[in-house]
Curated annotation (Swiss-Prot):
<dbReference type="GO" id="GO:0005759">
    <property type="term" value="C:mitochondrial matrix"/>
</dbReference>
<dbReference type="InterPro" id="IPR029061">
    <property type="entry name" value="THDP-binding"/>
</dbReference>
<keyword id="KW-0809">Transit peptide</keyword>
<keyword id="KW-0479">Metal-binding</keyword>
<feature type="binding site">
    <location>
        <position position="446"/>
    </location>
    <ligand>
        <name>thiamine diphosphate</name>
    </ligand>
</feature>
<dbReference type="GO" id="GO:0006091">
    <property type="term" value="P:generation of precursor metabolites and energy"/>
</dbReference>
<protein>
    <recommendedName>
        <fullName>2-oxoglutarate dehydrogenase, mitochondrial</fullName>
        <ecNumber>1.2.4.2</ecNumber>
    </recommendedName>
</protein>
<feature type="binding site">
    <location>
        <position position="674"/>
    </location>
    <ligand>
        <name>thiamine diphosphate</name>
    </ligand>
</feature>
<keyword id="KW-0786">Thiamine pyrophosphate</keyword>
<dbReference type="Pfam" id="PF00676">
    <property type="entry name" value="E1_dh"/>
</dbReference>
<dbReference type="Pfam" id="PF02779">
    <property type="entry name" value="Transket_pyr"/>
</dbReference>
<keyword id="KW-0560">Oxidoreductase</keyword>
<dbReference type="GO" id="GO:0031966">
    <property type="term" value="C:mitochondrial membrane"/>
</dbReference>
<dbReference type="GO" id="GO:0005739">
    <property type="term" value="C:mitochondrion"/>
</dbReference>
<dbReference type="GO" id="GO:0030976">
    <property type="term" value="F:thiamine pyrophosphate binding"/>
</dbReference>
<keyword id="KW-0496">Mitochondrion</keyword>
<dbReference type="InterPro" id="IPR031717">
    <property type="entry name" value="ODO-1/KGD_C"/>
</dbReference>
Length: 1027
């Protein structure tokens, strides 16, 4: 890393001139962009001969030269001589001819050589000049080594057992002998380079330099920042750690810290005493987390942030709820009692619960809102949810740069290094439609994962190395130095405010108990836990410190301990009086105003006026004058206008009418996912690109009216897990919005299965949290193989909370039955087959008096299918979503003669229409589409069954028998038919382990086999049939 053979070859005159021209630009004000350009030009010409130009010394030399240009006497005489030689025309190697070299064992020898006659007027003694430059470079390299590698030998482990970076060796570049320096040089004075702020003086002795570097970089704080590519950011961090006395706290600040440590520590001790056999995932061993979070909030509030969204795992959660959010202690303690819930929902364990509280921040004297997002035990899954929530809050507040809204994410060391969603979430950091302009990450680094040693749980030196990918500064800090923790938290808050980038605070700590309080850690970590038993708490150590410093006396300490003990006991007594638990006390995203004056069983019409339809399609089919549109898209847009005239609108028009009508009503619409701007199947084209002007775009749906709701359509990163989580978090903030995530193919949605299972399907039941998120999952068997055919509808249907048996004696169809079903369901599962129905479904998501997630199996081939069209009247006022679409052809005119009543869902309907015609069964077989699978339309299915009393009931599907909707619909249809002694039969593919065949021939044979079963005809009658 530090090779003088690369670094000590100083710049050529051409390089010096490039620096001079850059430094003189704009009245001697350094301009970063011209400087970078000049560097590139200089390097391009001489990089082969000047390898140091890619090294760290180039920046150092430039800084020295710029300083010399302003004032030659401000640099050491050796540099003054060198620059004068170069200015006089000395070429590379002529200003001095003997660059020193660094050897691991030894010396920086400098061979004597006469300087050339390039600048006789300014020639100094050769050996003295070269030796002096060599000394300065040694010091610069030494300081840089501590800045770069000092964290590797920092005293970070409060137990004194491990090295936080899993390596107990000392980097050789941190040894004086690496630079040919030794004891004899300790009292020599050296000029400090401009890349350090360790002293207000221009020079220090080597002894003082080493002392300061070790104090800054090798004690209880390890600072990782030299991987940052921005010199301004590096200097910013240096100033906040290297400047003398910068980390000191006042007596008042120390007292605040002490009181916060009391609350954090005594809260856990109190719970352990009252409920010794309860799991609570306490914070013992990292009690400083509470003061750390509070310091981040205090500093950020002072800097203008008024809304904080916290995502965290289970460890320490109760403590955060009690001492950061200030949720009433009695409410928290009542969770330890066995009490009946007072309201709906299944609830969740106490260490998963969320909360949203507004209160006065005493340090900033400003009101702040703090939300802790409820989450499952699936570690790190909450990260993107928090980021989406922050982004949405900032959007609705008009806080474009997130100056007032911020995420604080807490992590465990093993999960932070091990869970892929962490990197997926980091990757959203700087994406225009996803950035939250910086989050503060706090890692509770227990140095263990459940029972797994860090050496078995990660391949990187630190658990935080994932943050280096996106340029995070990383501050490692020993929790036994609470004051260092406070300083780091202040810097983190200031960094986020200044640069709008993520920052990581790594609290190196330990876990005093096992993974939970009932776990025995000595089984697997005996030596660590022997040491832990001998280790005092951070509170005890800090108490001794402030007493020794005279910050507080024994009486003050005793009073503070007694005061908080009394608060806990009082809360405990109040908790004993609680007779029930209210799940609503734990809402992380309350919508109180939304539910007021709304009839939960009234579903408004979703149709719109004719003139509105014409206006939206008119805009959707046009583009501005002077915009250079692709010729192919010109035809597409003209086609949209023609569809309106022909009274036959396609899928893209149905989507556009849903979005456009909501936008005109002031509703915010957000569509996110891979390739959604164009659409995976090139049907949407909501963002038009000028063919001649780069980055010039036009979004017709954002140009409908003034004012209107904002339409955000954004291509996402190639991630399902993080992006779906992000959109879920976004949907939680404001119910008056339509938030949609579209998978590239429905098959890929299972990459986000954790979000689907733990948040979307069960979120309302566990956390009383509603969401109107829509998931569009392209689905359909078209011979494209096992990974491009199925969105796995069976899985989504299996997670529906609806009973598969219905008591016809107790259920009254009609009236509010449909609304009641929607109110009670955990989510809506639909497979729409017409543009009008997808339009109504999307609008219904916003017009309903409550919010439910919707899983929609969207089409692929139907996007352009000539039969998959809807007339304009199907969108007009008075029209609504059709839960089923009954047969309207010849069979419906003569029901007694119908031999088979076939229920189906999705694209297969159009395949069966073609097959029915092919085999001549147009009068004998009625085809009914179930558009909404869940809640199941019992009432409408019953009507169809009674209409065709003599018909055989068939369920037909293109999916295999062990997939698709069959296992879901069979018991439901049969519960309706049982009273008549009838039952439904299956027609479709046989069971399979793979969703679909990858062979086109096999696919066609399966299609024909299925159709022969549906229509009861020999397979031979389907020769020549193509679906």
């Amino acid at each position: 890393m530090h090779r003088a053979s690369l670094i000590c070859r100083l710049a050529s005159p051409s390089r010096i001139n490039s620096i001079r021209s850059a430094s003189s630009y704009g009245n001697n004000t350094i301009s970063a962009t011209p400087l970078v350009q000049q560097r590139k030009q200089s390097v391009a010409a001489s990089v082969k001969h000047e390898p140091f130009l890619n090294g760290s010394s180039s920046v150092y030399i430039e800084q020295m030269y710029e300083t010399w240009l302003e004032n030659p006497s401000s640099v050491h005489t050796s540099w003054d001589a060198y620059f004068r030689n170069v200015e006089a025309g000395a070429g590379p190697g002529q200003a001095f001819q003997a660059p020193p070299s660094v050897a691991y064992a030894g010396s920086m020898g400098v061979p004597s050589a006469p300087i050339t006659s390039a600048a006789p007027a300014t020639r100094l003694d050769t050996n003295a000049s070269v030796q002096s430059i060599s000394d300065h470079l040694k010091i610069q390299l030494l300081i840089r080594s501590y800045q770069t590698r000092g964290h590797n030998i920092a005293d970070l482990d409060p137990l004194g057992i491990n090295s936080a970076d899993l390596d107990d060796t000392i980097p050789p570049e941190l040894e004086l002998s690496f630079y040919g320096l030794g004891e004899r040089d300790l009292d020599r004075e050296f000029l400090l380079p401009p890349t350090t702020f360790i002293s207000e003086k221009k020079s220090l002795t080597l002894r003082e330099i080493l002392q300061r570097l070790k104090e800054i970089y090798c004690t209880s704080t390890g600072v990782e920042y030299m991987h940052l590519n921005n010199l301004e950011q590096q200097d910013w961090i240096r100033r906040r750690f290297e400047a003398p006395r910068v980390t000191e706290l006042s007596h008042d600040q120390k007292k605040v810290l002490f009181k916060r440590l009391i609350r954090s520590t005594k809260f856990e001790e109190f719970l352990a005493k009252k409920w010794p056999s309860e799991k609570r995932f306490g914070l013992e061993g990292c009690e400083v987390l509470i003061p750390a979070i509070k310091q981040v909030i205090d500093s950020s509030s002072t800097l203008g942030v008024d809304s904080f969204v916290i995502g965290m795992p289970h460890r320490g959660r109760l403590n955060v709820l009690a001492n950061v959010c200030r949720q009433p202690l009695a409410t928290i303690l009542s969770q330890f009692s066995t009490l009946e819930p007072a309201d709906e929902g299944s609830g969740d364990v106490k260490y998963h619960l969320g909360v949203c509280i507004e209160r006065l921040n005493r340090q900033s004297q400003k009101n702040v809102k703090i939300a802790v997002v409820a989450n499952p035990s699936h570690l790190e899954a909450v990260d993107p949810v928090v980021m989406g929530k922050v982004r949405a809050e900032a959007f609705y507040a008009g806080d474009e740069k997130c100056d007032r809204t911020m995420a604080i994410l807490l992590h465990g060391d093993a999960a932070f290094a091990g869970q892929g969603v962490v990197l997926e979430t980091f990757n959203l950091d700087d994406l225009p439609s996803y950035t939250t302009h910086g989050a503060i990450h706090i890692v509770v680094n227990n140095q263990i994962g459940f029972t797994t040693d860090p050496r078995s749980s990660r391949s990187s030196p630190y658990c935080t190395d994932v943050g280096r990918v996106v340029g995070c500064p990383i501050f490692h800090v020993n929790v036994d130095d609470p004051e260092a923790v406070m300083h780091v938290c202040n810097v983190a808050a200031d960094w986020r405010k200044t640069f709008k980038k993520d920052v990581i605070v790594d609290l190196v700590c330990y876990r005093r108990h096992g993974h939970n309080e009932l776990d025995e850690p000595m089984f697997t970590q005996p030596l660590m836990y022997q040491r832990i038993k001998q280790t005092k708490t951070a509170l005890e150590k800090y108490q001794e410190k402030i007493l020794n410093e005279g910050v507080a006396n024994e009486q003050y300490v005793k009073e503070e301990l007694t005061k908080y003990g009394a608060i806990l006991e009082d809360a405990y007594e109040n908790a004993q009086k609680v007779t029930y638990v209210r799940n609503r006390d734990w809402l992380d995203s309350p919508w109180d105003d939304f539910f007021k004056k709304r009839d939960p069983l009234k579903l408004p019409s979703t149709g719109i006026e004719q003139e509105n339809i014409e206006h939206i399609i008119g805009k959707f089919g046009s583009y501005p004058e002077g915009f250079n549109l692709h010729r192919g898209l010109e035809r597409t847009l003209k086609g949209r206008q023609q569809m309106l005239k022909d009274n036959s609108l396609d899928w893209a028009c149905g989507e556009a009418l849903a979005f456009g009508s909501l936008l005109k009503e002031g509703i915010h619409v957000r569509l996110s996912g891979q390739d959604v701007e164009r659409g995976t199947f090139s049907h949407r084209h909501h963002v038009l690109h000028d063919q001649k002007v780069d980055q010039k775009i036009y979004n017709p749906l954002n140009d409908l009216a003034d004012p209107q709701g904002e339409y955000t359509v954004c291509n996402s990163s190639l991630s399902e897990y993080a992006v779906l989580g992000f959109e879920l978090g976004y949907s939680m903030v404001d119910p008056n919005s339509l938030v949609i995530w579209e998978a590239q193919f429905g098959d890929f949605s299972n990459t986000a299965q954790c979000i689907i299972d733990q948040f979307v399907s069960s979120g309302q039941s566990k956390w009383i949290r509603q969401s109107g998120l829509v998931m569009l999952l392209p689905h359909g068997y078209e011979g494209m193989g096992p990974e491009h055919s199925s969105a796995r509808p069976e899985r989504f249907l299996q997670m529906c909370n609806e009973d598969d048996e219905i008591d016809l004696d107790k259920i009254a169809f009609g009236g509010t039955f449909e609304a009641q079903q929607l109110h009670d369901t955990n989510w809506i599962v639909a497979n729409c087959t017409t543009p009008a129905n997808i339009y109504h479904l999307l609008r219904r998501q916003v017009t309903m008096p409550f919010r439910k997630p919707a899983v929609v199996f969207s089409p692929k081939s139907l996007l352009r299918h000539p039969m998959a069209r809807s007339p304009v009247e199907d969108f007009q006022s008075g029209s609504n979503f059709q839960r089923i679409i009954p047969e309207t052809g010849a069979p419906s005119q003569n029901p007694p003669n119908v031999q088979r009543l076939v229920f189906c869902t999705g694209k297969v309907y159009y395949d069966m229409v073609a097959a029915r015609k092919h085999v001549g069964k147009e009068n004998d077989v009625a085809l009914v589409r179930v558009e909404q699978l869940s809640p199941f339309p019992y009432d409408l299915v019953q009507q169809e069954c009674r209409k065709y009393q003599g018909a055989e009931i068939i369920w037909a599907q293109e999916e295999h028998k062990n997939m698709g909707a069959w296992s879901f619909v069979q018991p439901r249809i049969n519960s309706l038919l049982s009273i008549d002694g009838r039952a439904t039969k299956y027609a479709g593919r046989l069971p399979s382990s793979s969703p679909a065949t990858g062979n086109k021939y096999t696919h066609m044979q399966e299609q024909k086999e299925m159709m022969s079963k549906v229509f009861g005809v020999p397979k031979s009658k389907l020769e020549g049939f193509k679906a």
